[in-house]
Structure formats: C-alpha cells, structure tokens
Amino acid sequence: MGTSKGYIAPTRPEWSASKRSVSTFLRNRDTDSKAKAVSKFAEAMSTGTSSASAFSSAAGNVLAFAKGLATNGLNNTLSLFGRDDLIGKKPDEILNALLDQFTNSGATIEDSLAADALSSAFDELNISSSDDLAHVDLNDLLREMITAFINFSFDLHYHEKIGQGRTPAETKDILTDIHKYIANALHDKLTPAEIGKINLSSLGDAALVSSMLHDAYSICMDFYGDSNK
C-alpha cells in the first residue's frame, strides 16, 4: 500500500520522532534502528488515529459474527446482524458481503485500511467463507487482524518515503523486514485474554479491539527495549 490519494500525514510531535527513526533505519539498516523505528511508530499510533477507530469497529464486528456462528448458527447470526438477505447464499459470498458491510465498502482511506487488514488476516488463516470463520480460533483471528492492521498502517505512512530512490523490489524487501519484526513481536506476546467478553448483542465490541490494539502498541514499544538487553 502506498500513500493513498487524499491522505494527510499526521503532524503531532510523536509522528516527527517516528519519521526520524524511520530515516535512521533506512540509513543504517541494523537491528537496533529497526527496533527503534517500530517502537516510535507504535508510540505515534497509540496517540490515536481515525484509522484505528474504523478498524476497531470492523474487527469487532468480525469477532462478534464469528462467535455468533459458533453459538447460534449461521442463519440466526445473519438475522441478528440484519442480513436476512444473505440467508441461503454461498458461504464465500456471505463472507465477502459482510466484509464489505463492516468496512463501509472502503469508502474512506480508514475504511480501506481496515478492509486490507481484515482481508490479509483472513488469507493468513485460510478463511475464505463463513464456514471457515465459524471454526477459527478467536484469539488467533484477533491477533492476525491487529498484526495486519499495524503492518498496513506502517505501509500507509512510510511506503512512499521508503520507496524514494529504491526499486519496487528493494522497497518490498524493507517493508517485509518490518512486517516480520512486528509479527514476531506480537505473535509471542499478544494474548487477548478479554476475548471472551465480546457481547454478541452489541453487534461487535470495538472497545475490546481498541484495548487489544493498544496492548499491541505497548508490546511493539517495549520490544525495542527487550532487543537491547
């Protein structure tokens, strides 16, 4: 993902520090500067962005729907979400329609970012239909969605900067390196113990996702200190 049309870069001091740390990483390309770049990026993201709100809403709906499938079955859950029109549709069509609904058809940059993150998480967990979603581990799903969101957010903010003076292949390699670092930090340490508190009747719990997202930011910030011990 490059910088989207209409995207306005944040101007808070935390983002200035993040930009400097990314510049240092691009010059040095060592483990320490990479860890600091991710840490400063996570710190800047933790100050609050509209993209996080859109993602939390969409991911909360996905989690609630998945839990509903396991406890109430497909048709009842579709009815609870106001989607009786999808009853009888093919499982892959149902999943695509819900993803479109939960992300407002990618109407804004924030919605598009959420859609990219959810789609990436589904691919990572081999979820291609509502049937697959019914059997997924909710902890794994939440962790993958959050990891994908942070990675795509990094791309949104820094793809263009990283690509300056570099080939597409070089840019991809650098971003992949960052993505792997973030994934490694989160997959071992992010344990969403609050997942069982999702309230199906609320049609998703954005507050839960938001809380877990901030836990993820903290892990990424702390991972820099751990890597220097």
Describe these PLM feature segments.
Residues 156, 160-229:
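Alpha-helical oligomerization segments
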